[in-house]
């Protein structure tokens, strides 16, 4: 059959233009994709695509293990984690491994074990990736029909979706089991400055858990990022674990309804676009969580939030000047407002000065000093504990801010040399990567929709100037 265009000049979305061609190779002629298109060459080769995905998982796990051991090798117990540029050890510490009261690291061996386990796992995954890429069957449908698939098989696709959902649900329950039965997790709100504890009474009330979803994402509401206790965190994982597992079973046992069959595009590239969109959404949520939340991301390990550092500075100077004889209740600042304390718009007693903008900040080192109407003057005069002073002094000099001038009253120039908060790293990296994933979602969604609608795929190159130029030799 005569083809209208050269296959070398046409890049395909899902199917080859010439249906008579073999799909067994990995070159441009047989797949319609050049080498730099990567896994697109394997769209119809389920065995080889499995190898690519397993190898990719191996690379991810290898990075986790190697970076884990790198951080362990460079870790200095005398310094806080957030001062050492660590991003993996804080996650392990949050899970309750190797830490004691106040977030003090008392044993680094669990971190070493974690790194080694990840490296061993990456070797297994790497072997599987190489095997399925080079040795195993090119397609799974004939030899292993359970693992085989056709992209347009709607029932098979939802079955695969269901299996993935169940695996995610089990993952959510791993945190629940760790928190409730296997040693507990680190709770920054534990009395006395945080500690590892067993979560014995996780929140199961749907009104509380789903109430977070109904909150506004703006202002003081904070949507799900406003969670401020470990009972709600673990209870939320119980709910999401149940929903994922039961949703997975549902998708395995049922076939897509008619409206779903009509609404979605059922092709490999469409599934890729859906996945990229979901990852982008989760990346943006993770960005906000790591920046604003100090419960799931304890400040003992990740450093203070911006508002927390600002409030810590106001608190530190209040403690200092009160010892020097200042009347913290009535002293005025240069603007006539309270220098140390003032009233919020709703009448609560709050810290004065420029940190007033963060008056609704909540942090475990300051909450014990509050009363029914904001900060309690009697507690500020008589009940401040040494650990609160030490922590606020540490936090005020480790704001997660990239500015050389004052932001929110924080004297950031003292942070300008050799300090970038893990919150800054995590928030900016997740925001940026989520944006790129979202662009990928739009790109692949557009291509998948065009293919489904029968539009011309690829770029018309018949009139491309370079095709009419003399060869270089």
UniProtKB/Swiss-Prot annotation:
GO terms for molecular function: chlorophyll binding; electron transporter, transferring electrons within the cyclic electron transport pathway of photosynthesis activity; metal ion binding. Residues 1-14 form a propeptide. It is a multi-pass membrane protein. Pfam families: PSII. Binds multiple chlorophylls and provides some of the ligands for the Ca-4Mn-5O cluster of the oxygen-evolving complex. It may also provide a ligand for a Cl- that is required for oxygen evolution. PSII binds additional chlorophylls, carotenoids and specific lipids. The keyword Kinase does not apply. Its main location: plastid. Keywords: Acetylation, Chlorophyll, Chloroplast, Chromophore, Manganese, Membrane, Metal-binding, Phosphoprotein, Photosynthesis, Photosystem II, Plastid, Thylakoid, Transmembrane, Transmembrane helix. InterPro entries: PS_antenna-like (IPR000932), PS_II_antenna-like_sf (IPR036001), PSII_PsbC (IPR005869), PSII_PsbC_sf (IPR044900). It is found in: Plastid, Chloroplast thylakoid membrane. [CaMn4O5] cluster binds at residue 367. The keyword tRNA-binding does not apply. The modification Phosphothreonine is found at residue 15. The modification N-acetylthreonine is found at residue 15. GO terms for biological process: photosynthetic electron transport in photosystem II. PSII is composed of 1 copy each of membrane proteins PsbA, PsbB, PsbC, PsbD, PsbE, PsbF, PsbH, PsbI, PsbJ, PsbK, PsbL, PsbM, PsbT, PsbX, PsbY, PsbZ, Psb30/Ycf12, at least 3 peripheral proteins of the oxygen-evolving complex and a large number of cofactors. It forms dimeric complexes. One of the components of the core complex of photosystem II (PSII). It binds chlorophyll and helps catalyze the primary light-induced photochemical processes of PSII. PSII is a light-driven water:plastoquinone oxidoreductase, using light energy to abstract electrons from H(2)O, generating O(2) and a proton gradient subsequently used for ATP formation. HAMAP family: PSII_PsbC_CP43. Belongs to the PsbB/PsbC family. PsbC subfamily. This is Photosystem II CP43 reaction center protein. It comes from Mesostigma viride (Green alga). The gene is psbC.
């Amino acid at each position: 059959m005569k083809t209208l265009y050269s296959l070398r000049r046409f890049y395909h979305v899902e199917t080859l233009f010439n249906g008579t061609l073999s799909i067994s190779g990995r070159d441009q002629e047989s797949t319609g994709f050049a080498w730099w298109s990567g896994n697109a060459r394997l769209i119809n080769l389920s065995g080889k695509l499995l190898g690519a995905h397993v190898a990719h998982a191996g690379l991810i796990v290898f990075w986790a293990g190697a970076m884990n051991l790198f951080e362990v090798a460079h870790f200095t117990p005398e310094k806080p984690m957030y001062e050492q540029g660590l991003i993996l050890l804080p996650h392990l510490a949050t899970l309750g491994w190797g830490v004691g009261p106040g977030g003090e690291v008392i044993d680094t061996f669990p971190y070493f074990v974690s790194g080694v386990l990840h490296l061993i796992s990456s070797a297994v995954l790497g072997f599987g990736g190489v095997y399925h890429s080079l040795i195993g069957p090119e397609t799974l449908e004939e030899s292993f029909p359970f693992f085989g698939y056709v992209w347009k098989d709607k029932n098979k696709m939802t079955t695969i979706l269901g299996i993935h959902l169940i695996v995610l649900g089990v993952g959510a329950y791993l945190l629940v089991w760790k928190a409730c039965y296997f040693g507990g997790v680190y709770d920054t709100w534990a009395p006395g400055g945080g500690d590892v504890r067993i979560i014995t009474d996780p929140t199961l009330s749907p009104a509380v858990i789903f109430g977070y979803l109904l909150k506004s994402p703006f202002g003081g509401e904070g949507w799900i990022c406003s969670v401020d206790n470990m009972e709600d965190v673990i209870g939320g994982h119980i709910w999401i674990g149940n929903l994922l597992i039961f949703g997975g079973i549902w998708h395995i046992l049922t076939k897509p309804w008619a409206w779903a069959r009509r609404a979605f595009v059922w092709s490999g590239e469409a599934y890729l676009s859906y996945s990229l969109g979901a990852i982008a959404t989760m990346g943006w949520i993770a960005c906000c969580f790591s920046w604003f939340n100090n419960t799931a991301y304890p400040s003992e390990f990740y450093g203070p939030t911006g508002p927390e550092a600002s409030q810590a500075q106001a608190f530190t100077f209040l403690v200092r000047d009160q010892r020097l004889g200042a009347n913290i209740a009535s002293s005025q600042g240069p603007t006539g407002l309270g220098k140390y304390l003032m009233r919020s718009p709703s009448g609560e007693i709050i810290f004065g000065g420029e940190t007033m903008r963060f008056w609704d900040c909540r942090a475990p080192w300051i909450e014990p000093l509050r009363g029914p109407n904001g900060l309690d003057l009697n507690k500020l005069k008589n009940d401040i504990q040494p650990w609160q002073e030490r922590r606020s002094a540490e936090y005020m000099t480790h704001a997660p801010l990239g500015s050389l001038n004052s932001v929110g009253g924080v004297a950031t120039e003292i942070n300008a040399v050799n300090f970038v908060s893990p919150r800054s790293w995590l928030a900016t990296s997740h925001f940026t990567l989520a944006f790129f994933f979202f662009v990928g979602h739009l790109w692949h969604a557009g291509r998948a929709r065009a293919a489904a609608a029968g539009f011309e795929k690829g770029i018309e190159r018949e009139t491309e100037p370079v095709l009419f130029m003399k060869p270089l030799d």
